[in-house]
Regions:
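C-terminal outer-membrane/trafficking sorting elements
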Residues: 523-569
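Exposed beta-strand face motif in extracellular beta-rich ectodomains
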Residues: 277, 499, 557
Length: 569
């Protein structure tokens, strides 16, 4: 699970069980401290930063071990069982919970506000998937509860603030199913492919999630499986499940007065992300600390990365990328660029617009995808509009536990950033409370991260109109040799891409145009890598990490500055 303004916090929380089991008067701040609940959209709310995963998380490659893993069907209108679950000591705070979460999951149009900021969500979970699949997948969620679990929150959530080894998500799901199994009607429709298994069980548990504002005893949102032949609903077995929290760590935006402590219902982004795991998609962010690098992932441009928190905290999550649509076999118009020509992109992939592809001539599984991002409909949460270019090093049998970006400096799916830096959320600087004015400094760091995202796409905030090997942009290279046997300046391990883009522009209404160059080296003539290269004084390490422009802070070593190797002694 990725984060909004994200940083994995390493500080342990030593708060009382009472505070953690939240009367929801306190939420977990980025530094691990429990603080009063802020108002949605306030400056203080920016300091409540969700976490990607517990510090001790070790993924399991479920399908690599079991090739017959049953993923949730992703076509048609399968019925998904949703259980609203109270803990023994923490109850639902959302008004009209069954109706509110029916809207959350199933509303066909605008969501009505039932008193908990319900209409902050741009649409329902079902609407999201209908839009991003172009109508091929429109799940229907059957809502039951709230039911009462037999144990306190601590039993399921444990007491550790920074890892999940003391949590019991399977027990939570098992107990929820045992409470609801005699209530469920039309059991057969919960098994759309008639394989004897309920397609998926989604449990919404009361209160906050530890991944986003909850204390040490709260539960992490997650997706996993249960292997228990005795656990059934009717004659149907249970396997796939996802769980997520009831509440978002903020008070509603429009309060009656300062004494109004009405909590905000959760955003749909985490639910869309976790449910996508149940359908087989992996996390796109790295899960190993050695890969917590800039230019290593997709950040806010992908639901399976930070995009689950797009739209001010996940209220307008990013649609699937073209790569993800392709994995699901959903309609996506991907066209290979081969001949030099001028191209126009008028629509997003969600609207059926073309997605262009540039492929390594010697490796069909290595390519770049070009998508038009227009800040309309489900793309309203995007950081900017323009041409999104991302590198893909594809592989067979994509699975939930693959972690494609865990190899440092060699991501399988990562942004090609127009401004030379797709900043990792792991790299956001955190000022400690011992520093003067630390709160304001941290807000500035978070704003800086969000502002930097705007430069990832073309032309972006830096007005970058070209993409070629002279531009020395990270991730614009081949891992294996393409049609020229020359290594890149930024990273001597990888090869130059001989294809290029020129005259990239975007109109006010979001239309992207560019010229595709099939043989950049021939079109520019024989030249050294520095010919026509812009001197921008950007500093990179030899493995392509961007370090800014201040040479005074450099340690001893070799760096790339203005496309040349510079030795600092």
């Amino acid at each position: 699970m990725k984060t909004f303004l994200l940083a994995v916090c390493l500080m342990a929380s030593s708060l009382s069980s009472h505070a953690d089991q939240e009367n929801t008067t306190l939420v977990r701040r980025y530094d691990g401290k429990m603080v009063p609940v802020p108002v949605l959209g306030s400056a203080e709310a920016q300091l409540i930063t969700p976490r990607k995963h517990p510090d001790n998380f070790q993924g399991v490659k479920t399908r690599a071990i079991d090739p017959n893993t049953r993923y949730t069907p992703h076509t048609g209108k399968p019925h998904i069982l949703v259980i609203l679950a109270n803990f023994k000591d923490v109850k639902f705070k959302v008004k009209e919970p069954k109706e509110a979460f029916n809207d959350f999951f199933n509303a066909p149009g605008a969501i009505s506000d039932r008193g908990n900021g319900n209409n902050e969500n741009y649409g329902s979970v079902s609407q999201y998937f209908k839009a991003t699949s172009r109508g091929v997948f429109e799940p229907v969620f059957d809502i039951y509860g709230p039911i009462d679990l037999p144990n306190d929150m601590t039993y399921y959530g444990g007491k550790k603030a920074n890892n999940r080894d003391d949590e019991r998500p399977q027990d939570l799901v098992r107990d929820a199913i045992n409470q609801v199994k005699t209530m469920v009607t039309n059991i057969d429709r919960l098994d759309s492919n008639n394989d004897g298994y309920i397609d998926c069980v989604y449990v919404v548990y009361a209160g906050l999630g530890q991944n986003n504002g909850g204390g040490a005893t709260s539960v992490w949102a997650c997706t996993s499986v249960i292997n228990d032949a005795s656990l059934k609903i009717g004659n149907k077995n249970i396997y796939n499940f996802s769980i997520g929290a009831e509440l978002f760590p903020s008070l509603i935006r429009h309060r009656a007065n300062a004494q109004d402590h009405t909590m905000q219902i959760n955003s749909i982004g985490v639910t869309c992300h976790e449910f996508s795991h149940a359908m087989g998609l992996p996390d796109i962010y790295p899960l190993t600390s050695s890969a917590y690098l800039n230019n290593q992932e997709m950040e806010f441009w992908d639901l399976m990365d930070g995009g689950e928190y797009a739209g001010n905290g996940g209220f307008i999550p990013m649609p699937y990328t073209a790569w993800e649509k392709k994995q699901m076999n959903w309609p996506v118009n991907i066209q290979l660029l081969t001949t030099e020509s001028s191209m126009t992109m008028e629509q997003t992939a969600n609207d059926g617009g073309v997605v262009y592809k540039i492929t390594n001539p010697n490796d069909k599984d290595e390519y770049f995808l070009l998508e038009n991002i227009i800040q309309t409909d489900w793309y309203k949460g995007a950081s900017n509009k323009g041409l999104l270019v991302y590198k893909v090093w594809d592989y067979d049998k994509v699975n939930m536990g693959d972690y494609p970006n865990n190899t440092p400096g060699k991501p399988r799916i990562a942004v090609v950033p127009a401004d030379g830096l797709c900043m990792s959320s792991y790299k956001i600087q955190r000022h400690e409370s011992t520093e003067p004015n630390y709160k304001e400094l941290n807000k500035q760091e978070q704003r800086k991260y969000l502002e930097q995202l705007k430069g990832d796409i073309f032309p972006g905030t830096s007005n970058v109109k070209k993409l070629n090997f002279d531009a020395n942009i990270p991730n614009f290279w081949w891992y294996s040799q393409g049609d020229i046997n020359e290594k890149t300046t930024l990273n001597a391990n990888y090869y130059k891409v001989n294809q290029a883009l020129d005259n990239i522009s975007i109109s006010e209404d979001g239309k992207v145009t560019f010229k595709y160059i099939a043989d950049y080296k021939r079109s520019t003539g024989i030249h050294s890598p520095t010919v026509n290269a812009q001197e921008d004084h950007r500093i990179f390490t030899l493995d392509g990490r961007y370090l800014g422009t201040n040479t005074e802070k450099l340690h001893k070593g070799i760096y790339i500055i203005n496309h040349k190797k510079i030795v600092v002694k």
